[in-house]
Amino acid sequence: MKRAICLLLAVVMLLALTACGGKGEKERKVIIPDWLNLESDMPLVKEGTEKTLRVWIRREPTCGPYQESWVYKYMTQVMNVNLEVTEVPGNSMQQQLAMAFASDELPDVMIGFQSYFNASRLTQHGAVDGQLVDITPYLTEKVMPNLYRVYEEFPNYRQAVTDSEGAIYGLGLIMSENYNTTPMTQWINYELLEKVGRKEPQTLDEFLDTMRAIKALDKSMVPIGGGYDTRNGIGMLVLNALGYLTTDPNGLAPAIRNGKVVLPAADKEAFGEYLRVLKTCYDEGLISKDYFTINGDQIGALVAEGKTAFLGGGAWPWQYDKNANENWWGLSPLTSDYNKTKQWPKATSAVTCGGFVITSACPDDMIALACRWADLGYEKHNYNIFNKGPHIEMEKDYMLGVGGWYYNEDLVHQFVDMENNPTKWANLNDYLDAKIHLWYAACWGYFDYDGSEDEIGYYVMNIYPDITGVEDPSIFRDYEPESGALNNVDYFTMAATLEIYPYITFDTYPGNVFLDPDLTEEVADLRTALNTYVRNEVGKFVTGKRALTDAELTKYFSEVNKAGAGRLLEIYVDYYNNLEK
């Protein structure tokens, strides 16, 4: 009913105020223009024709001029697509995109804004407001052959980005079954473990005792890094130790516990213990006294000074510690009195949904071109070159001013520009941002580690050591594979991640939740109120402003239900039960 009212109002406003712009939720005519090349990947636009896409792209100030990036040159000079680029940095992304949709002043395509375009926003801007294009009419073997084949083989990938009415308003990153279990690795500093004579903790109690021992080395230590509003704090580790399968460190997203859908922050079974653990850490100085306000720079400074022994998911220690490859390693899941099974959720980012979107501003005859561009990323080689540039042999005719990459005789990944200018870039990521990338990080495409050794340009899974059952994984910290396609940082992060692989479970709540428009609006309102309430009350419990007693916890759970948790859980349970298994 709400959607019908919205559509009626939109029609009335368009008739009365045509100068205000906005296309509304109109039927888009599917046009496959003659100038679009459907016979091969390149060029996208046939020679002799000029076509321009207006595109907003997330780029950070640390990136070089976009006109100098290899991908920009490849798209414009090889693919024959003119790009009118607007750069949007992450720190203003939310505001800029919100204003663009509110004013209906949109580009044709938006790339790299997956942290903005969650399932709820895709439904709102697409199904409700009519400001995004449903790409399903173009999802054919002729127009989008690469993604079509992926969805044919893995229909669950398509389901993960499809809304309740069968539309797809945004595409994202797909990690294959060979890789999509990659979790948010928890990191522990083994150098500090060795200083206090401890091995890797196996239980939540052992973990806290280990952090206490490290704190005793130096009272200025903050053994547990991160904060409440960052994804590298202790929250996810504790919640999973208590039995909640979740990647949300604050317990505000639906999770699975003992086979049932729960909202951890409203769950009487174990959320009280989560609060007690955080309060213990706060009272004993195991976490920062600024836990609820600390930012990334402050967290990094503590790591760089050697005063932190643990970083949660989403953190990469080498960002802060130049000796990370020697000092840090993955931490396996913990158990507790509330949960006797080591378990860890697969990454919710295995299939994302908002890295590449086409807006209603895109002309009808240009939508197919935008879809063809998006489709390129779902073929392995194209995905590879979009993210690391040209191979010196496979793209020898399209180097476009960069040196390219190759594998040396030991199959070690090498970039020619970095070899020739060893001090010009601090690390590989800086080089890629400066010379290769057009958009910020990998945001759409098919990321498939298939284990092949005969495909140049792809990682080889069998070079990783098998650490299943190894009592002390630190023995692998200095391990150098005899051959392999990983540089040191890649090897370090992937091998450390394997510490958690034996405990991965796929029995998790879906990462993308597409509800009908009415429920999407209701959930957005409920989550806003609930998130504010929970954050405030958790802060009070942890810092001692609210007594952490059984009586106060009873009041809290009553209040949290009144704030909307009960209704929210009902919606999440119904959605989960109605999913196609």
Feature roles, as predicted:
Residues 136-139, 163-236, 256-307, 311, ...:
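Helix-loop-helix "hinge/cap" segment bordering the ligand-binding cleft or interdomain interface
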Residues 120-137, 320-343:
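Ligand-binding "clamshell"
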Residues 39, 58, 384-536:
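Conserved small-residue motifs centered on glycine
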Residues 1-9:
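Positively charged n-region of N-terminal signal peptides that target proteins for export
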Residues 279, 326-335, 344-361, 365-437:
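Polar, glycine-rich mid-to-C-terminal structural blocks
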Residues 6, 20-190, 194-206, 245, ...:
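Conserved N-terminal structural module of periplasmic/extracytoplasmic solute-binding proteins
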Residues 108-111, 309-313:
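Paired acidic/hydrophobic, glycine-rich loop segments that form the ligand-binding mouth/hinge
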